[in-house]
Amino acid sequence: MNKDNKVIQLDQSFSKSGGEGQVTLIKNSQALYGKETVAKEYFKTPDQDKKAKISYMTSVDATSLLDVTAWPIDAIFEKQSKQLVGYIMPYTGAREPIHNLYTPTSRMKHFPRANWKFLLFVAVNVARAFSKVHKAGHLIGDVNHSNILVGTDSKVVLIDTDSFQVRAPKKTYLCDVGVKDYLPPELFGKNLKQVVRSQNHDNFSLSIILFQILFLGRHPFMGRMTTGEDVSLEAAVERLLYAFSSNARGNHVQPPPPHMSFQSTDLPRYVSDLFERSFSKKCLTSGRPSASEWATSLDKLRRELVECTSNSNHHHAKGMSCAFCRLDQERIKKNRSPIFGTPTKGKSGGLLRRAPQKKRPIRAPQKVSPLQGTTPLALSQLAPEAEFHNLSGVIGPETYVERLKQSGGAALAVLVAVGLLDSGAVFLGLLGPAAWLGMATIQRVKSLGWAPQHAAWMLLPGVNVGLAIYLAMAKRKM
């Protein structure tokens, strides 16, 4: 029952277990609260301090926080003993933990239309959510990537609010838990049950979350020591070995190489400088960027984003090069999916989905008059399932050649395909500069239908300016 002695009807068909308790949808929430709500029932009877904290949180006007937090709006009492056993909070809807935005695989599964512009929207919303909590006089405290939920609308909700540090008129209810990956180093080794946290502590944790959003899951202290020393992530945080710092070499640490990771130099200075301040030893006591400062700067970056001229699914700051073209080139070499999926045609509008790839039937080569022991092939016969990866996605050979014809006159001059005795194929391409820039790799060629003793080749028209040679090996699965 709730504090008004009204019976709470639980819908056991929608129930999830957490670390502290069970969260269940309330059947009669519309009648009781006029909106969808859930009940969190503790596995263990909470202590007196926790009960007092929940009682206070449910008694204050938290209207300004309800759109960004799962703030308790009512308490749950056991019917017989009248003991507080949990609380009621707004239902957050279909949202995912923020870490599901970090990697291409989890993004494609949970946020298939997300690109970096979307991630920037999320980062702004995270900073604004922190700012609202801070303005209300409270702190998140236990910041980690599991208690920040994100929807496909980019809106953010902070959960586990009963662990917040809550300021009441006569008492401050502390946050006695924390995750070391996000805990500021000045709190390492401290008894959190006795620590009154400050906004500067929250600001450190917020900066790590924002870094992971923008850097696609990278932790700011996950670098490599140039001295060969083996340093754990926890030790790196404690020593403030910020791997992406402009002074990283002075600390004998370096980030992953540019072809493998987003870099601080891929951000405008007014953003990268905030990370420098966040993870600087000078800011151990004060001076880390506030949540509102982060929100302002990230929103400025969001408004200054431009769409990449080579890939409609990539975005970058105005006047800067596209980091994701650089990263995708390396991923394609390793036969891995693009960071943000295949671009769609036209403008992105901030959210794109992976364009479905049409499977075309394999066609046998036409029989034509042999030429010097070879069988010439028409373009339509040339690897109907070959995938040409360029900066604008995966295209077929016909589309690729058409794009080359429009690329400024320097087009593909000669394409020679040689059948091998082991059923594989080698493509040797002589490319003009525009063609060379346009194509990242030929991913695979299969089922060409060539006899092993034959070679197939074709001359394509075009002006060849400055030849470059590209060799790709494609093994056909038997």
Residue ranges, per PLM feature:
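ATP-binding glycine-rich phosphate-binding loop
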Residues: M1-G34, K40, Q48, L66-D67
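Conserved structural core of kinase catalytic domains
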Residues: D67-V122
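Catalytic-loop of the protein kinase fold
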Residues: F130, H134-D153
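Activation segment/activation loop of eukaryotic-type protein kinase catalytic domains
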Residues: S146-F188
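Conserved end of the kinase activation segment
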Residues: L187-N200
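Conserved C-lobe activation region of Hanks-type protein kinase-like domains
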Residues: Q199-H201, L210-S272
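Regulatory extensions appended to serine/threonine kinase catalytic cores
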Residues: P289, E293-D299, R303-L379
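Membrane-cytosol interface at the C-terminal ends of transmembrane alpha helices
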Residues: G429-Q453, M458-M478
